[in-house]
């Protein structure tokens, strides 16, 4: 099982190293046969190769079965043209692998309800996974344009585009609490009608998973009023963009949020947080999101669901007993990782 490691910039190398320590500890005990090769990416690749996603990295990604990514960007490269900034490497990476589904879990860990902006009794038990379609919808639909008098965009989805992201969501729900909520605007938009009908057709292949539908405006309200009711949520590109950001504030810290991007090529697993150049090299970065991204890799790239849950449980215990500085504790990157390993 080959993993391409892209540490990136800022705190990326530090938190990625923490995630690798956890993976290697599991490998030693379970004999997983994981192998790792590190490649330049983002600003680090610009410095060495003049571009954020060089050919050597592209080939490494294509030869791997999963990508573990750190973070990209920083003020050092902000003055560069937009097309060659570190962040453009992310778009190129996703496009090269045809990654059409983004998975963003938002979980309020037991004992950390106080961090959520919601009341503790509302935040308690929140564990929702947002599955967002990444490559279609209004962000990519044609025709699009703007004149002095008007502007226009096109919301468009084909049946295969909806079917494939729906299958990803149903599969994810099957590994969790077996409940999928599909979000659309079927009462106003034909695309929403089409989305709902197609998801219902896909549901026939997953009779063990419960399915319900929500309009996007109602869904935004429910995510604030009663987020614990949801298990897996699937939706289109623009609605997923908004709802995943809304859900991301529920745990109370970006340092807790992993993500996965899945598709036809090599899947990518990365923290939601940025490169945080202000704390890079200080040994205080919270590695939780990177470690949980590694857990998502075990589950979604290699099918090791039980091991992924063990990592999540170890992280939850470490967060409760020895939280890192951004969560009100004092455990630095190394110390927190040691605690995760101890609980693991």
Swiss-Prot record:
Its cofactor is Mg(2+); Mn(2+). NAD(+) binds at residues 74-87, 274-286. One of its GO terms (cellular component) is cytosol. It is found in: Cytoplasm. Substrate binds at residues 94, 104, 132, 217. It catalyses: (2R,3S)-3-isopropylmalate + NAD(+) = 4-methyl-2-oxopentanoate + CO2 + NADH. Its EC number is 1.1.1.85. SMART domains: Iso_dh (SM01329). It comes from the Bacteria. Its main location: cytoplasm. Coiled coil: none annotated. GO terms for molecular function: 3-isopropylmalate dehydrogenase activity; magnesium ion binding; NAD binding. Belongs to the isocitrate and isopropylmalate dehydrogenases family. LeuB type 1 subfamily. HAMAP family: LeuB_type1. This is 3-isopropylmalate dehydrogenase. It comes from Thermus aquaticus.
